[in-house]
Structures are given as C-alpha cells and as structure tokens.
C-alpha cells in the first residue's frame, strides 16, 4: 500500500495464517524454522531448494533460508542461488544473535539500495562476524569492522 518492503524473520517459529505469506516481501527462516512451517525435514541442498519452492507456492515473494555454517539460500520467481558462509578468520564463539545480525544487516543493505544479492552477502558477512564474539547485541560488528574483514 505504501511501497514499504516487509521482512518477516519467524524466530521463534509460531503458527502463521498461510494467507499472510502473500503479504511478505521477504521471509527469512533458518532451517529449523523452515521445517516447522513445511513439516518436512531439510538436510540436503535439494531439500532446501524444494523448501524454497514450497514457500514461493505459498505466496512468499522472496524466500531466504539461513543455513548457519553452510551460508544462505535465496529464491524468488526469477532466480535461485546459494551464498557460501563467510570464511571466518577467528573461531566461532557464540551463535546467539546471528540470525538477528543477519536480518538487521539485510534490512540495512536494502535501505541503502543494495541489490538483493549484495544485501545478502553483506548480511551473511555481518552474521558470520557476530559468531566470533560472545553475546547478542555486543557481538554486532560496526560498518568499519565489516568493511575491514
């Protein structure tokens, strides 16, 4: 109505009226949350692609499934691809808040007019860096840290 993009990160997963999927521009579950909504186990790359297509059939315009150390999957009616996880310079310390880091960074990327894929790459990088630190909010990197990583 007002040309605003909608992003729903369903964490934690809760029942959603399926007709509301069509209202979403971006739906960003992780693997576990995607399994909750589709009632299917998602383990292989092919399972992920099938899940993505199922969400599109439900009306989601753009599906993003975060895959932790395996990266992220994206699909819409025109394209489908995987983005590898960031090759970390440091050990993973704590994954708390990584999904929040991803979603916040993705929204920032879109707000700064990045193309979808570039916003996903940026978000993936932010989430990866956040796992190398303890905590949730305290683990979020600055723009400078992301650009220098």
Predicted regions and their residues:
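Conserved phosphate-binding/catalytic region of the ribokinase-like
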Residues: 15-20, 45-149
